[in-house]
């Protein structure tokens, strides 16, 4: 069996927790922040756990956990 390649773009975007959950950064935080509400900017800080429907897709991109 040959080695599986890690998708490098996904490895830079996702992190695994010790319990096996996958975290991601938030979108819409790079620029044009003036028109966005303070609530939206505050809630998009930090990392968030991905939705369970996306787990299989991300795990295929990161066969060795990133």
Swiss-Prot record:
One GO BP: translation
GO molecular function: structural constituent of ribosome
Any Gene Ontology CC annotation: cytosolic large ribosomal subunit
Keyword entries, A-Z: Ribonucleoprotein, Ribosomal protein
Family assignment from sequence similarity: Belongs to the bacterial ribosomal protein bL35 family.
Protein's name according to its UniProt entry: Large ribosomal subunit protein bL35
Organism name: Leptospira biflexa serovar Patoc (strain Patoc 1 / ATCC 23582 / Paris)
């Amino acid at each position: 069996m040959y080695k599986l390649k890690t998708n490098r773009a996904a490895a830079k975007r996702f992190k695994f927790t010790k319990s096996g959950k996958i975290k991601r950064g938030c979108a819409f935080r790079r620029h044009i922040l003036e028109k966005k509400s303070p609530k939206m900017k505050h809630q998009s800080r930090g990392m968030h756990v991905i939705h369970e429907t996306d787990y299989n897709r991300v795990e295929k991109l990161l066969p060795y956990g990133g």
